A protein has these predicted regions:
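Extended low-complexity intrinsically disordered regions
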Residues: 1-59
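Hydrophobic/aromatic-rich structural module bridging two neighboring secondary-structure elements via a short loop
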Residues: 60-63, 67-78
Length: 78
């Protein structure tokens, strides 16, 4: 198990990567709340399917995808 410090450092690194992508990646730069919405809906349905199946590995993966979208929306809004 990773320490809280390691988990915090990993989360900070994720935020840094998202900052860099938003600044430098052409696709990321042009995304809006509206353009990202269909992808978010798809990820949410994938999470729902994993939950219904009780597949912990898939649930974890899909939660990561949804979290990434939450962070992306926060970056768009900032």
């Amino acid at each position: 198990m990773h320490t809280i410090e390691e988990k915090a450092a990993a989360f900070v690194r994720l935020l840094q990567i998202m900052d860099e992508l938003r600044e430098k990646c052409p696709w990321d730069k042009k995304q809006t709340f509206e353009s990202l919405r269909p992808n978010t809906i798809e990820e949410t349905f994938e999470l729902a399917d994993a939950l219904l199946k009780g597949n912990k590995k898939e649930i974890s993966k899909e939660l990561g995808d949804v979290l990434l979208h939450v962070i992306f929306y926060a970056k768009i809004g900032s």
